Amino acid sequence: MELAEIRNELEKTAQQIKDFRGSLDLDSMEVRIAELEDQMLDPNFWNDQQAAQKVINESNGYKETYQAFHALEEEQESMEISLELLKEEADEDLQEELEKDIKAYMATISAFELKLMLSDPYDKNNAILELHPGAGGTESQDWGSMLLRMYQRWSEKKGFKVEMLDYQAGDEAGIKSVTLLIKGHNAYGYLKAEKGVHRLVRISPFDSSGRRHTSFVSVDVMPELDGDIEIEVRTEDLKIDTYRATGAGGQHINTTDSAVRMTHIPSGIVVTCQSERSQLKNREQAMKMLKTKLYQKEQEEKERELAEIRGEQKEIGWGSQIRSYVFHPYSMVKDHRTNYETGNIQAVMDGDLDDFINAYLRSRIG
């Protein structure tokens, strides 16, 4: 890279930093961080643990953005100083180091820009992720367990906490359905990119003839909503069943009927929860999930109406196939919405999803 090219790249990144500063109200951010820190110093702060966690998450989100922006500014300044030194006197080692730094810096800017894109009202929330294998018995249920592992690995890499709200084991292998609560800042903002049908093509390990099989799993993703959302659920509209909680392999993990299945009769929505040992807590969590689903249904209906008014042929919901994972006759994972693809299928199954998620989020604002 010639010095003129380095200068051009640094001029571009300097403009990006300027644009970031224009879109971030840093003064207001400082004030809000101070307010939240004052709340955390209150002796009664932990009396309401749910409210306390909400304050901590908000504070961490602002701090992360604030610190990341200032780190970008400092790095920009440092590289501009290196460029000035190179103009005064050629230094091969310094130039090589600067070229590497610029490449890494551009990737960091890209990641920062992506975080700023997560500005929808619930992007910052925790995510509820459900996996539902399609028809195909053991084959599709095994595919469900592979996706479960993939999302668990991705969450670990992000530093997110995963709670298993519900687990229904498959008949021979895999899962019949799973509900996860993924806790972390912007968890929903990222994972909304995964909503849809995921298709697998492989030689089935369950087929003695070694034939190729195609399996489908639908992934549904919702933000975990707090108590601020007003959704009325009438007691007479509910059917509540209780049963023994089961774990992987089908064994009972509790001796009482602590697991809860809640059916909302007017909408047909069913939610289940067995993560807690107490039936009462499982009821509370199931009600929270039900309200989230009812709210989501309401929002999707509004979106559908708006699309019809505008004359848009826009599919809403999770019924569309979004991504294919092909293990045979070649290795390829391809997202059908963005056309982003990779041949490194094992890395994807080990949780390397960020490139797919990033491509989707960028396509939404493109």
From Swiss-Prot:
Coiled coil: none annotated. It holds the Pfam family RF-1. GO terms for molecular function: translation release factor activity, codon specific. GO terms for biological process: viral translational frameshifting. GO terms for cellular component: cytoplasm. InterPro entries: PCRF, Pep_chain_release_fac_I, Pep_chain_release_fac_I_sf, PrfB. It is found in: Cytoplasm. Methylated by PrmC. Methylation increases the termination efficiency of RF2. Keywords: Cytoplasm, Methylation, Protein biosynthesis. The modification N5-methylglutamine is found at Q251. Its main location: cytoplasm. The keyword Metal-binding does not apply. The gene for this protein contains a UGA in-frame termination codon after Leu-24; a naturally occurring frameshift enables complete translation of RF-2. This provides a mechanism for the protein to regulate its own production. Peptide chain release factor 2 directs the termination of translation in response to the peptide chain termination codons UGA and UAA. Belongs to the prokaryotic/mitochondrial release factor family. HAMAP family: Rel_fac_2. This is Peptide chain release factor 2.
